[in-house]
Amino acid sequence: MAVNKGLTLLDGDLPEQENVLQRVLQLPVVSGTCECFQKTYTSTKEAHPLVASVCNAYEKGVQSASSLAAWSMEPVVRRLSTQFTAANELACRGLDHLEEKIPALQYPPEKIASELKDTISTRLRSARNSISVPIASTSDKVLGAALAGCELAWGVARDTAEFAANTRAGRLASGGADLALGSIEKVVEYLLPPDKEESAPAPGHQQAQKSPKAKPSLLSRVGALTNTLSRYTVQTMARALEQGHTVAMWIPGVVPLSSLAQWGASVAMQAVSRRRSEVRVPWLHSLAAAQEEDHEDQTDTEGEDTEEEEELETEENKFSEVAALPGPRGLLGGVAHTLQKTLQTTISAVTWAPAAVLGMAGRVLHLTPAPAVSSTKGRAMSLSDALKGVTDNVVDTVVHYVPLPRLSLMEPESEFRDIDNPPAEVERREAERRASGAPSAGPEPAPRLAQPRRSLRSAQSPGAPPGPGLEDEVATPAAPRPGFPAVPREKPKRRVSDSFFRPSVMEPILGRTHYSQLRKKS
């Protein structure tokens, strides 16, 4: 019976025992993870038929391998059934203990994530409150204390000022200050002339003046008095500068210099402005029509010159009228206006520079139209003529008042040409005298040469030695001069000054290049 009973127990009548693998798979965390993995695998498998066929092949392979492994491991499992049972019981007890210690294993992943999020947010909120609340409370306390202190100090100061003003000494001090300020205002009104704006008020303000006004405070009265004094000071300085300018204009020589400076400044400004308006890279447009308008531009430039002169005269008249009138802006306003004009001219010159460079490039490449070239050339010639006139006047004045030696041009090496190359007649006579061997009865006179040419030198100083020119002719020998032996003429040492100039009448001072040109022409 015992054997039969054991056989029946082995056949399956044993009570069912818990399996560790089943319990682990039944845990909400593991089951949820498995479901998520299964959904991902299914969606990936359904994405493409090729992927589905590959996955099915792998599934069949895994199933066949698992069935083969179970069939091969079955004898081993039967022999080690007791050991597997003991290990299963031990694992179940450990799983029970783990579930007691970690209750989160009994909840799904969504719930665990939400609870974890709430826990983290509450912890962060509590940490932030623990830091910010003390700081906010402390700052509120500090600001409240500072505000209370300021209000207390302001109240104390106001009460003190009111108390001091209500005392006898305060009343006396305020009355004295009021009296002194009133006396100063009366003195200023008596000494200083009233302004036109204040003396002639608008009719709309007359009714407002009739209405009673509150007495201005001491500070406002002091400010008005200071404003009046400063305005009068500026006006006085402007009048003094104007009178000094008028007195300086009476000095001889100042008026021409000032007018010349004003004219130069106006010409320069007009040249810059006209150049800015004209230079717009004109050589990029209308290249063929430029040559046909040359004659018209010449006439136009003459008309423009007359118009420019008229504009200059009108501008000078306006400038003189403005200078004669008292400046309403005063000294500071004039300085500011001058600085503004200077800044504007600087900016205009800077902006005009690129266009000027492009125009210059066009002129170099012969692409600039004739109108622009002719007008620019005309203005440049007018400016050069004006400068030349000024220099001529200065030179004439210096020559008139300063004694200078009169200078004229002298032909270089003209005096010593006959020494190096004597005439043929002189050589013949010298040869006959030497052949005869007889001493000369008297000194043989040197051949008298003709006067030098008069094309470049009108007269010659009596002390200078005569020198033959290009057109000189050999004259007949003169009467013998007793007492002068016939000595061959020696070539004196040449000086640098002899090759360039000789004192004579007032003639232009020229160099070697100019002299060579004049010599070729003669």
UniProtKB/Swiss-Prot annotation:
Phosphoserine PTM positions: 81, 126, 130, 132, 137, 174, 382, 384, 408, 436, 497, 499
Molecular function GO labels: lipid binding
Region annotated Required for interaction with CIDEC, chain positions: 291-319
Coiled coil feature spans: none
Compartment annotation: Endoplasmic reticulum; Lipid droplet
UniProt keyword annotation of Phosphoprotein present: yes
First-listed, main subcellular location of the protein, grouped into a coarse class: endoplasmic reticulum
UniProt entry tagged with the keyword Lipid metabolism: yes
Domain of life of the native organism: Eukaryota
Keywords: Endoplasmic reticulum, Lipid droplet, Lipid metabolism, Phosphoprotein
One of the GO biological process terms: cellular response to cold
Region of interest (Disordered), residue spans: 195-217, 287-318, 413-522
Entry-linked Pfam families: Perilipin
Residue stretches of biased makeup (Basic and acidic residues): 414-435
Maturation and modification: Major cAMP-dependent protein kinase-substrate in adipocytes, also dephosphorylated by PP1. When phosphorylated, may be maximally sensitive to HSL and when unphosphorylated, may play a role in the inhibition of lipolysis, by acting as a barrier in lipid droplet.
Tissue: Detected in adipocytes from white adipose tissue (at protein level). Detected in visceral adipose tissue and mammary gland.
Stretch forming the signal peptide: none
Positions of post-translational Phosphothreonine modification: 85, 299, 301
Subunit structure comment from the entry: Interacts with ABHD5. Interacts with CIDEC. Interacts with AQP7.
UniProt record similarity statement: Belongs to the perilipin family.
Function: Modulator of adipocyte lipid metabolism. Coats lipid storage droplets to protect them from breakdown by hormone-sensitive lipase (HSL). Its absence may result in leanness. Plays a role in unilocular lipid droplet formation by activating CIDEC. Their interaction promotes lipid droplet enlargement and directional net neutral lipid transfer. May modulate lipolysis and triglyceride levels.
Disease: Lipodystrophy, familial partial, 4: A form of lipodystrophy characterized by loss of subcutaneous adipose tissue primarily affecting the lower limbs, insulin-resistant diabetes mellitus, hypertriglyceridemia, and hypertension.
Protein name per the record: Perilipin-1
Organism of this sequence: Homo sapiens
